[in-house]
Design a protein with these regions (language model features):
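Conserved glycine-rich cofactor-binding loop
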Residues: 15-16
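Substrate-binding pocket helix/loop in short-chain dehydrogenase/reductase
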Residues: 98-111, 206
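Active-site helix of classical SDR
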Residues: 125, 161, 169
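Alpha-helical segment proximal to the catalytic Tyr-Lys
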Residues: 130, 173-178
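Residue(s) in the substrate-gating loop at a strand-loop-helix junction
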Residues: 145
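Short, small/polar-rich loop/turn modules that mediate ligand/substrate recognition or access, typified
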Residues: 177-181, 235-237
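C-terminal substrate-recognition "lid" of short-chain dehydrogenase/reductases
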Residues: 214-242, 247-248
Length: 250
């Protein structure tokens, strides 16, 4: 894997499990990492920063539901750290709703899910793209989900938002080329607290239904993000599935 010395990586959703794992791998390869999260409580952020190799890493406050905050933080990061080479959109939100329970998927929940999981991704790209065009070989990585093409997952709105994210990845890869690459990553079940109520019992059932007989870990996703950033440098407009084969049997 290529080194990332001299590169600046921004991770939206930097205090989430996948964001943290990705930050650690980027830092281990020499990048300086800017982690963006809606809350930067030192009790939460300082241990994360302390776990990163190297120096120059920082936490910033912004919300993907507040475009002005994203514009401000993009300018602040460039001012503090210089040109931005890597943007990872890993912020997300969901809530379990059975696919056949139409009444439980309220208008308010649908709006919240699309606001975070689709509009928030676009708003981040819109805010950071002007600052990335000044960098060498910049790349945007959108964290999606196999729910986008299996129709399964925590709820229908989440699956639809992720399908929209995959389309966004393709469309912006064309629109922003050749200056920027835009790629995606589609995990399946990952051993995190992202989906409320899905604990060890759920993971065990999911593992038994996965060809590789385990659920993913945050590091599995982070390693794929690193690969898309480094060794897969000729890829753009594509979304890489990293799910242990789960989509084959869903």
């Amino acid at each position: 894997i290529s080194r990332l010395d001299g590169k600046v990586a921004v991770i939206i959703g930097g205090a989430g499990a996948i964001g943290i794992a990705t930050a650690r791998q980027f830092a281990a390869l020499g990048a300086r990492v800017a982690l963006v999260h809606r809350s930067t409580d030192p009790a939460r952020t300082q241990p994360i920063l302390a776990s990163l190799q190297g120096s120059g890493h920082q936490f910033y406050t912004a919300s993907v539901t507040d475009s002005a905050s994203l514009n401000n933080v993009a300018a602040q990061i460039q001012n503090d750290m210089g040109a931005i080479h890597i943007l990872v959109n890993s912020a997300g939100f969901t809530q379990p709703v059975p696919l056949n329970d139409l009444e439980a998927l309220s208008d308010e929940l649908i709006d919240s899910i699309f606001q975070v999981n689709w509009r928030g991704v676009f708003a981040s790209i819109r805010a950071f793209t002007p600052h990335m065009k000044k960098a060498q070989d910049p790349v945007i990585i959108n964290v999606s989900s196999i729910a986008a093409f299996t129709g399964m997952g925590s709820n229908l709105a989440y699956a639809a938002a992720k399908a929209g994210t995959d389309l966004m990845t393709k469309a912006l890869a064309k629109a922003l080329s050749p200056e920027l690459r835009v790629v995606g990553i589609s995990p399946g079940v990952v051993n995190t607290s992202f989906v409320p109520g899905c604990g060890p019992e759920f993971n065990q059932k999911a593992a038994s239904a996965t060809p590789l007989r385990r659920v993913g870990e945050s590091d599995d996703v982070a390693q794929a993000i690193v690969a898309l950033t480094t060794t897969l440098a000729f890829a753009t407009g594509t979304t890489l599935v990293v799910d242990g084969g789960r989509h084959l049997v869903s």
